[in-house]
Amino acid sequence: MSTPKELRYSEEHEWVKTEGDKVRIGITDFAQSELGDIVFVELPEVGDEIKADEPFGSVESVKTVSELYAPINGKVVEVNEDLEDSPEFVNESPYEKAWMIVVEPSDASEIENLMTAGQYEDMIKED
């Protein structure tokens, strides 16, 4: 199970990567392994506002449909359209090819409230 140290993590198994004044968001390796084979990804539109702890999209696997929860507040500035045709990227490359959205945060300090890799690893061990 991969948990890159440079990322921050939410309790809902999303990861956040800071890139200048924007953040890239996706789901963790742990989340994709729990979901099984991903067959469909539904994401917001560019320009949509997302609110922390509220759904911004969903992933559908052969087992279930799971909502994606926003780890921070902000405005969607980019969406990974490759996932529309290749949802399997979520299983194959959750931290690289399968990023979900890029967001301009309303308040970048919210990122500091998310878990470090070590804290996230401790949380998933308890599950």
UniProtKB/Swiss-Prot annotation:
Gene3D superfamilies: 2.40.50.100. It comes from the Bacteria. The modification N6-lipoyllysine is found at K63. Binds 1 lipoyl cofactor covalently. GO terms for biological process: glycine decarboxylation via glycine cleavage system. Residues 22-104 form the Lipoyl-binding domain. GO terms for cellular component: cytosol; glycine cleavage complex. The glycine cleavage system catalyzes the degradation of glycine. The H protein shuttles the methylamine group of glycine from the P protein to the T protein. HAMAP family: GcvH. This is Glycine cleavage system H protein. It comes from Bacillus licheniformis (strain ATCC 14580 / DSM 13 / JCM 2505 / CCUG 7422 / NBRC 12200 / NCIMB 9375 / NCTC 10341 / NRRL NRS-1264 / Gibson 46). The gene is gcvH.
